[in-house]
Amino acid sequence: EYSCFGTGDYRISALRVRNENGSQAVTLCYAGYELSRGKYSIPGLPAVYADETEAETLGILLRDPESGLEVLLQYGVLEELDIITRAVKVVNRTMGKVVLLKAASMCLDWLSGDYEWLTFYGKHAMERTLQRTPIAHGISAIGSVRGASSHHSNLFAVVCEKDTNETKGLCYGVSFVYSGEFLMETEKDQIDQTRLICGIHPDDFAWTLEPGESFDTPEVILSCSSEGFGKLSHNFHQVIREHICRGEWKNKRRPVLINNWEGTYFNFTGDKLVSIAKDAAELGVELFVMDDGWFGKRDDDRSGLGDWFPNEKKLGCSLKELGDRIVGLGMKFGIWFEPECISEDSDLSRAHPDWAVKIPGRKPNLSRHQMILDFSRKDVQDYILERLCSVLASAPISYVKWDFNRSICDKYSTSLPAEKQGEMAHRFMLGLYRVLDGMLSAYPHLLLEGCSGGGGRFDAGMLYYSPQIWCSDDTDAIERLQIQYGTSFGYPVSTMGAHVSAVPNHQTGRVTPLATRGCVCLLYTSPSPRD
């Protein structure tokens, strides 16, 4: 159930540690169990939630008889949904320091069988493309070390028998409830056993536990279907809609919105935005979203990021006045943020140069001319949360688009000692979740839409906070068919943001009839970015 490195199992392992004496051996033996009603929760992390009538929790305690290290395997059983969740708590009961080098959330073995697996690869503007490959002898893996779950591999996969299709065949699905760096591995060994492991990517991970300290892994959602991919997808759709998404928007019809980005980019004033909103209101559009460029010195993507103060000179009015004008048209008002990033040319960077993620003595690697803000630091989290809440309090804002337009490299935090730099990537994610939770606790009626250069962070972890995510920056109707098809294997249509966009399309140049563009996004959240 939870394989360990260094004591005779030579396949891919779920747990690898460095003991105080430098050895990496762990032998886990059964030490007890506990069964309870309801569903366990995980401190600081998103997870499936359910009450005592909907779920049971099984906890299996394992202990190393030599060192005293304890591992609690947690299972959440939602029987009516054919769902099992898994998570792990590692507790240092030894007499010395233990460093976790790998702590996966699950390990699953098939003792026999000939399997394939479905994974969902991609790139910017073409996310979650279905790929079906045999599980051959040896190791296969997907993952991300980009600081986020990424455009390139999604955290959902399916292991299936070879003849499985939409309506028949045996298949097993796994969805990682996390938004950061991850690794999902399969291995077929010399006697045709197959193993699947999923968890935080170990390449960027080393977590120190002093005696008495513990570490909680993120959660994995598991399901099985003997009726093909369709039934498996329905299981995941239901658990995400009802037991991951939260708040008043999880089952509520989302407003049809218009976003000014492709219509204006950075070139707008308050009057121009109101003009667009007025035309949209006459067509029945319900929400106007002001995108990038409303704050600081932000007339292009080279400056101003991090300075979350409205640029009243550019807008020609205060944020409240603009919001009131939009609301006066019978629409709701929304706004764009990218809180995890910072421009070198910004007041925030000049005031707090140590808040940017960069390695001392090295020139930082910029992407989209911007750096990452160190969300592993509590002072950074507190500052950003205060700024977000201040902006939200200043105007009638009903919706936030939360963007994240680059991957993380140069991973280093000035707040961590050298021996704890391997904790930075996961602490960053814990910080992000803390800020999101704080913002939504202060503004529970807010509709939050996730975005990461399009669909670069489309995962169950983010859906715990944002019930919809912008599916892709590719708004071409024909290419969206493939993107939305791949996404639908693991995620319900209610979570996918889609556009009726302008033609010729800004990504492909294709001219597609309005009826086609409308039909492609009809089942999804349906905005229009046109001017």
Name each model-derived stretch.
Residues 11-14, 18-32, 36, 169, ...:
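Glycine-rich, aromatic-flanked loop segments that form ligand/cofactor-binding clefts
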Residues 524-531:
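Conserved small/polar residues in nucleotide/adenosyl-binding loops
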Residues 251-383, 399:
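Aromatic-lined carbohydrate-binding/catalytic grooves of carbohydrate-active enzymes
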Residues 194-208:
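Short acidic, Pro/Gly- and aromatic-enriched capping/linker segments at domain boundaries
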Residues 207-226:
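Short Pro-Gly-centered flexible turn/kink motifs
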Residues 88, 212, 326, 448, ...:
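Conserved, mostly hydrophobic/aromatic
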Residues 1-187, 203:
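Polysaccharide-binding surfaces and accessory modules of carbohydrate-active proteins
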Residues 361-500, 505:
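Active-site neighborhood of glycoside hydrolase catalytic domains
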